[in-house]
Amino acid sequence: MPGDYYDILGVDRNASKEDLKRAYRRLARKYHPDVNKEPGAEERFKEINRAYEVLSEPDTRSRYDQFGEAGVSGAGGFNYGDMGDMGGFADIFETIFSGFGGGMGTGGTRRRTGPVKGDDLRLDLKLDFREAVFGGEKEIRIPHLETCQVCKGDGAKPGTGAKTCSTCNGQGQVRRATRTPFGSFAQVSACPACNGQGQVIEEKCEVCNGAGRRQVTEKVKITIPAGVDDGTRLRVSRKGDAGLRGGPQGDLYVYLYVEPDKVFTRDKMNILSEITISYLQAILGCTVTVDTVDGEQELTIPAGTQPNTILTLENLGVPKLGNDAIRGDHLITVKVDIPTRINAEERELLEKLAHIKGQSHGKGGLEGFLGSLFHK
């Protein structure tokens, strides 16, 4: 005896038609044999189908509510062959399993004759650091499917056409009946002769071999906006695969990967780098030339600059993505080089400086004295 159909779908007896549809979609996706290979999944799937078949139609639902299974047993089990007259039910199946590709196997497959959008494509593109900062144009080569210009996409040799598939009589699907102790069930799959189209080409196009599309490699210029970062995704409209039966072309998605730079790193819109100056430059101050993404720039080192001080070059960072009039800053970390060896003349001068400062340098040497000049 089958279980209670409301319990099978997990709904109460006052469930609306939309509640039933949502429950069915969820359970059918979960237990479909093409998706769920666990033991018992196929039987569970059949129960779900039967429950929805009965409860989705007001007449059969009313009889079931009054008399239980006995009131609907004359239906003889779920019949996939009737799906052509059950538009709503078949539409649910098509919605649920449209993403599985190649049809449902043992479930119901509707013949699709309308336009189908082409597949989207992905391309990974490497940029150097400056290209990511300033953007620009890149020319890439992308292999994709385009509509065959000889047959205009229908796959037939010019001057010929298509005929009704004799295997499925134009239905696009073949059915096989299976008898079980619980009743008869019809299993449906896409027709292998016409791939579910219901028609077969009399003479295939010699250029695309009947596919209606052919593989080509196209040169595409893409614009890289200023300020992109590692992992940024760009969409290039209508540069994916051509659609089927007049469907629109897919899109190309370009994923950007920024290669590390030897000098610069990035923190959002700011560019980071380091310079090393001598202890005398740190004490006395100076002007040095530093590398930036805009070329060499002069940087003023204030007198008494401490190690690891961060100095800022404003508006020399990364442009804001989508508004390159706004830029971040270039932040420069100053490293101070304290020598480990000095010559005699330097030693004499430093000893005089140590005497003036009233600092002893016997313990730890002059290196210790130099280190004491900076606050660490």
Swiss-Prot record:
CXXCXGXG motif repeats lie at residues 148-155, 165-172, 191-198, 205-212. It is found in: Cytoplasm. Binds 2 Zn(2+) ions per monomer. Keywords: Chaperone, Cytoplasm, DNA replication, Metal-binding, Repeat, Stress response, Zinc, Zinc-finger. Its cofactor is Zn(2+). Zn(2+) 1 binds at residues 148, 151, 205, 208. GO terms for cellular component: cytoplasm. It comes from the Bacteria. Pfam families: DnaJ, DnaJ_C, DnaJ_CXXCXGXG. CDD domains: DnaJ, DnaJ_C, DnaJ_zf. It comes from Crocosphaera subtropica (strain ATCC 51142 / BH68). Homodimer. A zinc finger (CR-type) spans 135-217. GO terms for molecular function: ATP binding; heat shock protein binding; unfolded protein binding; zinc ion binding. One of its GO terms (biological process) is DNA replication. This is Chaperone protein DnaJ. Zn(2+) 2 binds at residues 165, 168, 191, 194. The keyword Amino-acid biosynthesis does not apply. SUPFAM superfamilies: Chaperone J-domain, DnaJ/Hsp40 cysteine-rich domain, HSP40/DnaJ peptide-binding domain. The J domain is necessary and sufficient to stimulate DnaK ATPase activity. Zinc center 1 plays an important role in the autonomous, DnaK-independent chaperone activity of DnaJ. Zinc center 2 is essential for interaction with DnaK and for DnaJ activity.
